[in-house]
Amino acid sequence: MTHNRLFSAIAFTFILLLAFSCKKKEDKVEYNYLNGTPKFSIPAYVQPGEVYVLHPREVTRPSDDTSTDGIGYYWSVSPITTKKDTVRTEKDAASVSADYTLTIPDTLCTITTTCSAFAEGYYSSTSEASSIIVKPYGEDRSLKGITYPDKSKVITDSRDSKKYYYTTAAGLDWFVENLAFEGAGKPFLDSPAMADIFGMFYTWNEAAKACPAGWRLPSNEDFLALHNSLTGAKNTAAKTTFYGNMGDCMADAYLNDIKLWEFWPGVNINNKTGLAMIPAGYATINEDGNARYYGSTYYYTCWTSDEAGSDKAYYRYVYADKPDMLLGSGSKTDFASPVRCVRTSE
């Protein structure tokens, strides 16, 4: 009898749990979906002090929704903010802005900005974008590992007052960093904060006239002389690959403490020349003038002054896994590369 009672109690409990579980499923609320996502635009790299007014794409209720309420929006920026910032509620008039003003703080980190559109009875619609905060200038700048052999060797570009250190190699003065003149070209990933870190990316037509007065693009002959000075060779063929010793021109640089050149045992990065080549990569330009960027952390590229026919020009590049300087050619209008400027040594 006792066993029967125990069995009955267990069975009764199981039935109750099953009934409760079914009821929970029956009570589960299903929401509808809003139309669209609140997408917005912010550069992939930003710098302290910049102010961005972020404008989300409009989100709407389904066409069969007869409610007179609107759509609410809230924002958050991790790890900067810990609370959601509601800029518009459902009851607000449509004229109330859903925009969000973001001021970039003075710190080095990756921030994730999130915008959510919400309405009662609907799942929230969310969009997010990540940005890396970098510091282009100062002792705590993001780009580390660039050395200036002689700090007295510096020029000021009269067009924008930017300063460039230079070093002397093979009878020429060479910029130690990529040209950052913003009167032409595009910054890396279309992020103005990167102009003074990776330099600007120029088409050859832009690069041909981008250097400051008294400076010019290096020729293949200039790169040949540079390589001969490194190897002691007496090569005379300028339009070819130069083998070996390019680690003498590469800088073991870091961006926000992230190593730029990937390590390869066959490449001895030591920057003996002070040229401080870094792997900023290259870009292609489509017919609408928009750029796509490739090869950062893998390629150093630099335009030469030499044309390769009516619509192409030569550029030099160094790949992470080889101590060589290779030769390529690209469209004068659709291929974009950083630039180093040279002049005859004074």
Predicted regions and their residues:
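Conserved positions within compact, well-structured domain cores
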Residues: 137-346
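Solvent-exposed loop segments of extracellular immunoglobulin-like
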Residues: 60-74
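Surface-exposed, flexible coil segments in extracellular/virion-facing regions
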Residues: 74-102
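Bacterial Sec-dependent N-terminal signal peptides
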Residues: 16-45, 121-124, 128-152, 294, ...
